[in-house]
Amino acid sequence: METILEQQRRYHEEKERLMDVMAKEMLTKKSTLRDQINSDHRTRAMQDRYMEVSGNLRDLYDDKDGLRKEELNAISGPNEFAEFYNRLKQIKEFHRKHPNEICVPMSVEFEELLKARENPSEEAQNLVEFTDEEGYGRYLDLHDCYLKYINLKASEKLDYITYLSIFDQLFDIPKERKNAEYKRYLEMLLEYLQDYTDRVKPLQDQNELFGKIQTDFEKKWDNGTFPGWPKETSSALTHAGAHLDLSAFSSWEELASLGLDRLKSALLALGLKCGGTLEERAQRLFSTKGKSLESLDTSLFAKNPKSKGTKRDTERNKDIAFLEAQIYEYVEILGEQRQLTHENVQRKQARTGEEREEEEEEQISESESEDEENEIIYNPKNLPLGWDGKPIPYWLYKLHGLNINYNCEICGNYTYRGPKAFQRHFAEWRHAHGMRCLGIPNTAHFANVTQIEDAVSLWAKLKLQKASERWQPDTEEEYEDSSGNVVNKKTYEDLKRQGLL
């Protein structure tokens, strides 16, 4: 039986070896998406084991049962040599009884892990289960969610490719359609997105993500800024949809002038008691001014279950909105897969059956070639890689001017290799964003301008030029006097003031 100190030593060794293997795993170059996903899952498994070992170590150091303290006292007391020989005797006795006992060092186990990573078996190459439609983490498979969506009551009938474009635009759906069936659809969609994220991005801490989403949602919900769920007005009447606006009344006496019938209809719209004299009804109705239904005294309501129902509806709406908030976040995380899915579906719909079969055969052959062992490419001059994954020829590298670097200060000192990439970047998002930050339009006037100072000075010059070319009504607008003489506006006004016309 291992001693407490030996268990602690073994746990410390395992932690260090796990850290070393995780570092090597993360530094290993992944050439395909399959390799990246499998590597992330191996890393997460080691992280989970690391946390488990750390928890065991903490329990041993806490020493709630006092065994560690007893062992320390035994080996550090006055009879330490007697204790040493006693334990040595126990070890010899154990090996005498079990002469063929095999002990596998921990280093051997981790060496086997490294070998399995370098020469993976067929099972190790498919660590995660994906459907054929998902293409091992490349695409989304939302067909079940799509069928659930188009079967919702009063839902718009659309095709699958359109659904892929708008399935996250939940804020456009009217609140009247967000019922229990709609909530079940959201739960189904969210469950798939969470499961897919867990398979494609296993290192994503979903517990931390949930806390972040919840904090942001609570803040937006309280402020009334959450998309699709605007904050209700402060008046209790407008909150309940009544047609009487209390903002025009400053006292209950003014409300009393409306009469018994009008006050009764307004109180009924709120679910309040509508009996009593004219003064009592007016005072009861005026007491709701500037208040929400939840803040009113329950004794004012005709039936308490109605107020509970209103509060229940608010909680139900908040639950639905929180589901939407989670879906928004996961869709943003899976933005790349969503775009690839849209392109893949669009491409499949435009192809014939024979072309689809050929594409599937190509994908199978590509996956088989990806699974082959990748050799280390010799690339001492750091040349760009071609379509085959190998460095392009040096003469082609020189021909395209890829040895020339162009720096653009507007793009945040980003470096572009080759004149072609440099010229193309003026129309791309990075340069356009830099120009927008400077408050300058990205027009043809600023082609080949890479310095911020040059762009600002050119923009000032262009503004002056445009100002000088702008039409000046005082000097360019022409008038005709009574004698038929044509003069500009300024001269005409001067002559008119002097009475010379």
Swiss-Prot record:
GO biological process assignments: mRNA splicing, via spliceosome; U2-type prespliceosome assembly
GO molecular function terms noted in the UniProt entry: RNA binding; zinc ion binding
Xref: PROSITE patterns: ZF_MATRIN (PS50171)
Modified residues (Phosphoserine): 54, 121, 295, 299, 365, 367, 369
Zinc finger (Matrin-type): 406-437
Residue numbers spanned by region Disordered: 342-374
Pfam families the record matches: SDE2_2C (PF13297), SF3A3 (PF16837), SF3a60_bindingd (PF12108), SF3a60_Prp9_C (PF11931)
Bias (Basic and acidic residues) ranges: 342-354
Residues in the signal sequence: none
Domain of life: Eukaryota
Residue ranges that the Swiss-Prot or TrEMBL entry lists as coiled coil: none
Alphabetic keyword roster: Acetylation, Metal-binding, mRNA processing, mRNA splicing, Nucleus, Phosphoprotein, Spliceosome, Zinc, Zinc-finger
Skewed-composition ranges (Acidic residues): 355-374
Motif (Nuclear localization signal): 175-179
Positions of modified residues (Phosphothreonine): 475
Compartmental location: Nucleus speckle; Nucleus
Keyword Zinc: yes
Primary role: Component of the 17S U2 SnRNP complex of the spliceosome, a large ribonucleoprotein complex that removes introns from transcribed pre-mRNAs. The 17S U2 SnRNP complex (1) directly participates in early spliceosome assembly and (2) mediates recognition of the intron branch site during pre-mRNA splicing by promoting the selection of the pre-mRNA branch-site adenosine, the nucleophile for the first step of splicing.
Subunit structure: Component of the 17S U2 SnRNP complex, a ribonucleoprotein complex that contains small nuclear RNA (snRNA) U2 and a number of specific proteins. Part of the SF3A subcomplex of the 17S U2 SnRNP complex which is composed of three subunits; SF3A3/SAP61, SF3A2/SAP62 and SF3A1/SAP114. SF3A associates with the splicing factor SF3B and a 12S RNA unit to form the mature 17S U2 small nuclear ribonucleoprotein complex (17S U2 snRNP). Identified in the spliceosome 'E' complex, a precursor of the spliceosome 'A' complex. Identified in the spliceosome 'A' and 'B' complexes.
Family: Belongs to the SF3A3 family.
UniProt-recorded name of the protein: Splicing factor 3A subunit 3
